Regions:
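Bacterial N-terminal signal peptides
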Residues: 17-29
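Repeat-mediated protein-protein interaction surfaces in helical alpha-solenoids
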Residues: 33-43, 87-114
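Alpha-solenoid helical repeat scaffolds
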Residues: 42-43, 74, 144
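Alpha-helical junction/boundary sensor with strong preference for TPR arrays
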Residues: 60, 79-81, 150
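Non-catalytic architectural context of zinc metalloproteases
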Residues: 96-106, 113-118, 131-307
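Zinc-dependent metallopeptidase catalytic helix centered on the HExxH motif
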Residues: 294-355
Length: 355
């Protein structure tokens, strides 16, 4: 399959950037006047924010706070056309000073928080306006950006389905269990008791023969992808009415969550091939696979360069199981669309929290 290697993307710890030619088609439906109004409001908001951050950075220079000045200056994200910027909320503010920091550090952080909170409030108003104007996908993305600036923005957290959990910070509502060794032999893969781990996240059920640590890391990656997919394909899983209900204070969730998505991580490629070969004669040609008949993503550890493949296969699962496509979509036609949407998510790339 041809893949446009000119596609560029940047992702960071708290935000992701995606670029894909299809994006322009998606945005083409927005009337020019509406797009211009949003662009002007956004430009004005960002200009004020940038000015405040610049003043704070200069003050840090005067006080010899070199590291604080660098964080402040790098906070504004450079934006490039053809890229979509998506944000992953953190449980807590990643730049919060450690307890016992100097008085100057605390004063810097207080002012930094003040400017970011003002930006968050402005973004929140933009989000409400966009939703009301019939552009809920953009509103939903903006709500995530609100939490980059103010992780404790209570209304944005509520709308997006978060709850505060003690010192752990903000967490998605949904049952999660830490990785635990299997008590009985696995019914499918021959793993003995205590030789594999199960891990539940809000949206995934993970089984692996690797380790508890890798189960936890895989769960984090899958939840990140899930959050980004929901931002990129908002209309696929919910709608404007649902978002307006939440913004208006409604308690009904944006969507009734389907069953958790199954992911299996094998210890290595050899185990992956041996386990799946009986049902997939050409499995050795793959580096990860989503099998619709199993409703499961199968991956293997030991090669972190394959993370794009993980995203690709997990994206197929999201499209297939969130709204149940017909079995094996693309076999009889529109294969380009099925693969193109998975490649869209494969193009994700991380971008640092600050700058």
């Amino acid at each position: 399959m041809a893949y446009n290697r000119n596609i560029k993307a940047r992702i960071g710890y708290s935000h992701y950037a995606i670029s894909f030619s299809c994006l322009f088609v998606l945005f083409a439906a927005i009337p020019a006047s509406a797009a211009e109004d949003f662009a002007k409001a956004r430009e004005k908001l960002d200009a004020s924010f940038a000015e405040n951050l610049d003043s704070l950075a200069k003050k840090c220079d005067e006080l010899g706070l070199k590291d604080h000045a660098a964080i402040t200056r790098s906070w504004m994200i450079p934006r490039f056309s053809g890229r979509q910027y998506l944000f992953l909320p953190e449980a807590k503010d990643s730049v919060m000073p450690k307890t016992g920091g100097s008085d100057l550090t605390q004063k810097w952080y207080a002012k930094f928080q003040e400017h970011r909170a003002a930006q968050a409030d402005g973004l929140f108003e933009l989000a409400k306006n966009e939703s009301k104007a019939g552009r809920p996908a953009r509103a939903y993305q903006l709500l995530h950006e609100v939490l980059r600036e103010n992780p404790d923005h209570a209304e944005a957290r509520r709308i997006l389905g978060y709850q505060k959990v003690g010192i752990a910070g903000w967490m998605l509502v949904g049952k999660s269990t830490p990785p635990a060794p299997g008590r009985r032999a696995h019914p499918k893969y021959g793993w003995g008791p205590g030789k594999y781990w199960r891990h539940e996240t809000p949206h995934y059920s993970i089984a692996t023969s690797t380790s508890a640590k890798q189960a936890l890391e895989l769960g984090e990656k899958m939840e990140e992808l899930h959050a980004l997919w929901r931002q990129a394909f908002f209309s696929f899983w919910t709608n404007q009415a649902g978002l307006e209900h939440r913004i208006g204070g409604g308690r009904e969730a944006l969507v009734k969550e389907p069953k958790k998505l199954d992911v299996v991580l094998f210890q290595d490629r050899e185990e992956y091939v041996a386990a799946l070969k009986p049902g997939e004669s050409k499995i050795e040609l793959t580096t990860g696979i989503y099998l619709d008949k199993e409703q499961t993503v199968f991956l293997y550890a030991g090669d972190e360069t394959r993370i794009a493949t993980w995203y690709h296969e997990a994206a197929h699962q999201l499209f297939q199981e969130i709204d149940r496509f017909p079995p094996e979509p693309g076999n009889k036609g529109n294969f380009w669309m099925v693969e193109g949407m998975a490649l869209y998510m494969e193009s994700l790339a991380r971008h640092p929290t600050s700058g």
